[in-house]
């Protein structure tokens, strides 16, 4: 049986007095690609931030390799887990190489500054993402897809095998969405990285993830393989969406086809 790298146990998380995620249990299996889906405001990003130790738990816990993440030193967590928030912003004038080099901070200390190992990690990350030729450009000069690959490069330079991505395709056109998700899939296949990402596009989630977690109102409604999660009944329950689900003619994964008002069969 595949072990869980990251777990939530009776996890509740919120902002101020508002509870967003309530009494939630989740297992992220080692070597899996998990996509968290659900309507706006259901708690997807809040859950991811809690899993990445960016938000403290109100109650319950997050476990990283079986140990409570809130009791693990920050630097040690950063050597194992990398998280990219939604729409990250780089300081003006920062080059791609300088951004990627920031991924090496968890591996440095006052007695050990920049090393040949750091240099090699940055070069490898740039090569893996196809960004080596753009290393000298500033981040603000890049296209949306290139910018996202630069941030992923930084996460790769961090040297972790657990990657959390909060809506990595936001504000990208379809071609760049595919480009970024192809990269994530390749990184997973070549290195066995465990990936958790929040995605809005259900069809892309089904195509690129081997496990879906569907949330509503701060709770997990259903989780499992895409074919088990993206059913017409579940789409209606989670999204209030009347839709048909057919096999994707390219990938064979579930393809969600929403039904507009004009195309609904009249009730008898």
Q: Which residue ranges define each predicted feature?
A:
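Conserved structural motif at the start of ABC-family nucleotide-binding domains
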Residues: 6, 21-23
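The feature captures the beta-strand-to-loop junction immediately N-terminal to the Walker
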Residues: 37-39
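Helix-to-loop junction immediately C-terminal to a conserved catalytic motif
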Residues: 52
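Conserved ABC ATPase "signature" region
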Residues: 101, 116-134
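Conserved ABC ATPase signature
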Residues: 113, 138-142, 146
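Catalytic Walker B motif of ABC-type/P-loop ATPase nucleotide-binding domains
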Residues: 163-167
């Amino acid at each position: 049986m595949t072990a869980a790298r990251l777990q939530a146990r009776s996890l509740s998380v919120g902002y101020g007095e508002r509870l967003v995620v309530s009494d939630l249990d989740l297992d992220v299996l080692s070597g899996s690609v998990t996509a968290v889906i659900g309507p706006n405001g259901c708690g997807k990003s809040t859950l991811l931030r809690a899993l990445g130790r960016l938000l403290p738990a109100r109650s319950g816990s997050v476990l990283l390799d079986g140990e409570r993440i809130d009791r693990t030193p920050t630097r040690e967590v950063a050597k194992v887990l990398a998280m990219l928030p939604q729409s990250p912003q780089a300081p003006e004038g920062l080059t791609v190489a300088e951004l990627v080099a920031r991924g090496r901070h968890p591996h440095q200390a006052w007695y050990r500054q920049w090393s040949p190992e750091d240099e090699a990690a940055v070069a490898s990350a740039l090569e893996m993402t196809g960004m080596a030729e753009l290393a000298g450009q500033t981040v603000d000069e890049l296209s949306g897809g290139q910018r996202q690959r630069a941030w992923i490069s930084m996460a790769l330079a961090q040297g972790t095998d657990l990657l959390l991505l909060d809506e990595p395709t936001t504000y990208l056109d379809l071609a760049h969405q595919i480009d970024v998700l192809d990269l994530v899939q390749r990184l997973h296949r070549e290195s066995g990285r465990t990936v958790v990402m929040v995605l809005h596009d259900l069809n892309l989630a089904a195509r690129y993830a081997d496990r879906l977690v569907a949330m509503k109102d701060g709770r997990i409604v259903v989780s499992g393989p895409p074919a088990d999660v993206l059913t017409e009944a579940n789409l209606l329950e989670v999204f209030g969406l009347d839709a048909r689900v057919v096999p994707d003619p390219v990938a064979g994964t579930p393809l969600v086809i929403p039904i507009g008002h004009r195309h609904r069969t009249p009730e008898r």
